[in-house]
């Protein structure tokens, strides 16, 4: 009897676990997306701060590769940017990665083309989700109107 109850509890726990982690993953996604939008979609943030956050942008892109709609051409350009960025960071000067300077050219090229489209797609997806959440939220009629419909 005790073994059956223990097995049942394990099954229930394993059944609930995916739902709990899905909600946690979703909130992590939202938190990271908002963080990136606050940096890359904000004209008041300077390029050096944006450059420092490129690793987070790349990590987000790789963690959620299909969540942001991109054309095949934009996706290929973004992949190329990631390759160029990593190649640049692998070059060592006196045993350390470059500390700035020439990377601005790569970053400027990225922001001017695919980065802007990626961030815009990320922002537009957020706006669309906000509108659909608002549209799907249940509306409660005022009580006097509810009484009339009964």
From Swiss-Prot:
Main localization of the protein described in the UniProt heading:
secreted
Keyword match Protein biosynthesis:
no
In what ranges is there compositional bias, type Polar residues?
Answer: 132-150
Q: Does the keyword Secreted apply?
A: yes
Gene Ontology BP terms: cellular response to heat; cellular response to oxidative stress; innate immune response; response to bacterium; response to heat; response to oxidative stress
Signal peptide coordinates: 1-22
Q: Which GO terms describe its cellular component?
A: extracellular space
Q: Which cell locations does it reside in? A: Secreted
Q: Which UniProt keywords apply?
A: Immunity, Innate immunity, Secreted, Signal
Report any Pfam family annotated for this entry.
Turandot
Q: Which domain of life is it from?
A: Eukaryota
**Ranges for region Disordered:** 127-150
Q: What does this protein do?
A: A humoral factor that may play a role in stress tolerance.
Task: Give the family from UniProt.
Answer: Belongs to the Turandot family.
* Name this polypeptide is given: Protein Turandot X
């Amino acid at each position: 009897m005790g073994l059956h109850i223990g097995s049942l509890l394990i099954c229930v726990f394993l059944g609930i676990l995916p739902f709990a982690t899905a909600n946690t993953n979703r909130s992590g996604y939202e938190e990271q997306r908002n963080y990136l939008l606050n940096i890359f979609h904000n004209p008041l943030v300077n390029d050096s701060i944006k450059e420092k956050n490129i690793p987070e942008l790349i990590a987000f892109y790789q963690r959620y590769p299909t969540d942001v709609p991109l054309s095949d051409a934009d996706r290929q350009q973004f992949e190329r940017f990631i390759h160029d960025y990593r190649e640049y960071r692998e070059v060592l000067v006196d045993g350390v990665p470059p500390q700035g300077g020439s990377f601005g050219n790569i970053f400027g090229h990225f922001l001017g083309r695919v980065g802007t489209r990626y961030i815009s797609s990320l922002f537009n997806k957020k706006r669309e989700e906000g509108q659909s959440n608002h549209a799907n939220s249940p509306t409660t009629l005022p009580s006097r109107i509810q009484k009339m419909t009964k």
